[in-house]
């Protein structure tokens, strides 16, 4: 069957990504990260496991504010254990691993959202290509970590949900949502790759889970013991988005000192 493209209202999209009633919702994902270097065979560098807790807040103009927090941990691809130190296979240097701890990650939803309807399922496709000045490139202290003047990546998302729940006016959120996420991005600053040619390829998938207790146990343990801030989404929009690059800059001294990441963050 050929997919039919339908324009969905903002409220229907909010049901996919979070919930209409202001309650928070959780996503979880797993995957792998590979090196992609000209003239070299790929290397599977890491497995990953991650989560997001999000909330949508209605505005008077029928738009919605989206606010969230997200974690992703880099795992040993053989053992599945959390990596705190990593031996760089190109330089031989052992570096501190800086896991993803982004708070907040925010957005603003309005207008129509095209979905590919295929009978019982509907898929939303978002191909994003963020390109902007690299804030680390302006400082000499980061030249061995991220010297490129421009940050450039590709983020490819596919979110699939039950069509009936999407269109049902009585539901505030879909009970099932499956996400596929692929990414092409630069070396992470903590890898200390300097100006070496190449990229990272991410291949991951995940789903919406009912609550915190359905997250992978590794994430529950880390959040409970180290970063309880990530048990809950913000109750209202916060400041500028946190990214892996701004987080690295903020905690650069802790990285140099070999501290364990993510840096502890207390519950609000």
Name each model-derived stretch.
Residues 1-75, 206, 210, 221, ...:
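N-terminal segment immediately downstream of the Sec signal-peptide cleavage site
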Residues 8, 13-16, 20, 46, ...:
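Extended hydrophobic/Leu-rich segments
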Residues 9, 25, 60, 82, ...:
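Acidic, low-complexity intrinsically disordered regions
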Residues 15, 31, 66, 88, ...:
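Intrinsic disorder/low-complexity segments enriched in polar/charged and small flexible residues
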Residues 39-168:
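Predominantly extracellular/secreted and cell-surface proteins with exposed
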Residues 130-268:
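A eukaryote-biased signal for long
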């Amino acid at each position: 069957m050929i997919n039919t493209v339908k324009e969905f209202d903002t409220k229907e999209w909010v049901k996919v990504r979070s919930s209409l009633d202001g309650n928070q919702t959780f996503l979880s994902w797993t995957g792998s990260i590979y090196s992609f270097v000209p003239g070299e065979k790929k290397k599977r560098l890491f497995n990953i496991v991650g989560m997001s807790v999000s909330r949508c807040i209605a505005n008077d103009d029928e738009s919605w504010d989206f606010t969230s927090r997200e974690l992703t941990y880099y795992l040993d691809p053989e053992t599945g254990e959390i990596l705190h130190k990593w031996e760089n296979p190109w330089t031989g240097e052992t570096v501190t691993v800086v896991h993803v701890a982004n708070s907040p990650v925010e957005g603003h939803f309005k207008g129509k959202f095209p979905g590919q309807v295929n009978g019982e399922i509907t898929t939303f496709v978002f191909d994003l290509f963020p390109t902007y000045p690299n804030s680390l490139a302006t400082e000499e202290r980061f030249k061995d970590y991220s010297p490129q003047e421009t940050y450039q990546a590709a983020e490819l998302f596919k979110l699939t949900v039950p069509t009936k729940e999407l269109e049902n006016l009585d539901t505030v959120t879909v009970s099932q949502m499956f996400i596929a996420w692929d990414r092409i991005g630069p070396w992470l600053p903590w890898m200390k790759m300097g100006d070496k040619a190449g990229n990272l390829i991410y291949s991951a998938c995940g789903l919406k889970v009912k609550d915190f207790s359905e997250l992978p146990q590794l994430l529950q343990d880390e959040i409970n013991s180290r970063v309880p801030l990530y048990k809950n989404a913000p109750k209202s929009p916060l400041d500028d988005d946190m990214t892996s690059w701004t987080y690295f800059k903020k905690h650069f001294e802790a990285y140099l000192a070999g501290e364990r990441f993510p840096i502890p963050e207390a519950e609000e």
